């Protein structure tokens, strides 16, 4: 593809292992270079500034998801049939199948159950000499809630974390991480097809709603396996990322943890700040269906753009001192859960789980003392 000569290029691979582990210097360079930057390694236009990212996310008629939101064709093919990879009426219809499960009112009804789960998980963790924040807390809570909510059968849960991580990892460009992840993503889809074929979902669950919608011809039966995964994978990974990020940040900023302990009303905004500072979802792509200008830079019809949420959330044009973690800042407009019609459908539950975990910990844990150097996951 030929690029507009006026658009700058950034030749560093932002999906190398080192870049994945420390992406923010690269994002800062992209924002400095311009509103649109060509990435020759990925053959995409990077959108890295807050205002431009939000504008692209809100313009779902120009920047479509139906051709896939990944940076490689295999993942885009595997993602067919999901709400993530659909547009317009198709997207609205598929999202409506579970809409009643995801309203603020529906999520509020889960508060007591989530609270009870969190209390038990913290009890178990604090009985140990040392706690693995990721396994014992961040993973334990969503794993105790989401599979039952979705209706995933018990015999398929031992692989869920590996599959969910692989589903996200497969969304990157063709590199060793996405190539290794495709197997896990394909396994998850194959298992979901079996669940649909055998109708082995838990009665009264989200998965049950999906199958009933197909029975009533509201959606195609062929889309059911992908829709089962649609909520399951992201609901696990985003919440695990948010809680893990919170634990790490509060270990490094003990004064802010003390502020939360003294005033738990700060917790909802603290969760927004955690998601702003360490976005669980770093980026998704879109396809431009017409020639379009982004802040004076021309993106041609047919081009793929990479909307970098994590960069938008550190944009100095939008945030004062963006590289500082500050739970008192108004971070409600962060883009860590996306925006527009494709905003994360499960963000209400992710917020509830993360807030509840922090509330329980704030009552019972004076401080977090790292037992060693945190090992960061490498995920596209």
Task: Pin down the residues of each PLM region.
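Cytochrome P450
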Residues: 1-380
